[in-house]
UniProtKB/Swiss-Prot annotation:
GO terms for molecular function: nicotinate phosphoribosyltransferase activity. Its EC number is 6.3.4.21. GO terms for biological process: NAD biosynthetic process via the salvage pathway. The gene is pncB. It comes from Xanthomonas axonopodis pv. citri (strain 306). Belongs to the NAPRTase family. The modification Phosphohistidine is found at residue 214. The keyword Transferase does not apply. GO terms for cellular component: cytosol. This is Nicotinate phosphoribosyltransferase.
Amino acid sequence: MIIHSLLDTDLYKFTMMQAVLHQHPAAQVDYRFKCRTPGVDLAQFIDEISREIDALCRLRLREDEVDYLRSLRFIKPDFADFLALFHLDRKYLSLTASATHPGEIELTIRGPWLHTILFEVPLLAIINEVWFRNTSEPDFEEGRSRLREKVASLRSMPAGCKIADYGTRRRYSRQWHGELLPLLRDGLGEQFVGTSNVYFAKQYGLTPLGTMAHEYLQAFQALGPRLRDSQVAALESWAREYRGDLGIALSDVVGLDAFLRDFDLYFCKLFDGMRHDSGDPFEWGERVIAHLEAHRVDPRTKVLVFSDGLNIDKVMRLYQHFHTRCRLAFGVGTSLTNDLGPTPLQIVIKMVRCNGQPVAKLSDSPGKSMCEDIGYLRYLRDVFGLPPMAET
């Protein structure tokens, strides 16, 4: 069994789930899986993946796990009580081999947002681990050697250059993930600030990290009063739920231009910072700092979180570029948890509908956008004043 606990996921799934429970418990959503890596035959392992999903759906949180969640300052008692009764239901998930693209799988999730939000991360971890254990021989000593080199590189930097683990969804295996975290903790000391993985945070006494993901802002394209106001509605909803806690806003759901137009003086003061997850990180940082300064907010009081495809070299370059001008945080994923030699898979599960309406992410990186409805993508770009889509 690959997933042993419902805590083996990213913290932001729980923080979003709590907001959904309190504000949108009746919302219905659709998610869809996509493998961006060409030539990957996942269909041959569909039965194995399906058995792992069955095992996942039998899991419930243990009393000590619920108590751990209760101990987090932002988890409210009613949500912890709800989680004590919660389990993932297989009826909301469909897994078949693609009839039109040999070797590909069709994985969709459809049901109440509240009851499906926890599927994404463990499903991606399952697919990854099934793939790698059937197609590669792990070289853990090579992985340890590479990890030691990364630790040494970071140790050569000033103490303020710190990283966190964001690598659950694309890890090589649960066992390797569990091995590398104490190595990072012991090797980096205060330069390792925590992990997005709640299970391992509990196990190793690390700080669990995370706020919101793209799906939260995407959903408000259907839940909000007007499409043009969807980002504002999502951020205000978050502020109502957490009252200043968990104050990192995600900036690339409809692109940075549209985000900065919505992120006015009120949000600049209210939120602790912003997270970068697509596009050029140096350009993004410069624009965010300029935006804060234009609103008379000192960037040195705000956090810029970088989490898009980071490796240690990029972390060090970003730190050297920005560290005197703002506070910094770095979430490193695949480069930590899946650097054993085999090529990592580029796999995602994205929300594509909410309450029957299409929703979309207009990423700042080509190829990261995902939507089933081209007409809606054109409309979304028009509403937010973005350039028209290139015709193909």
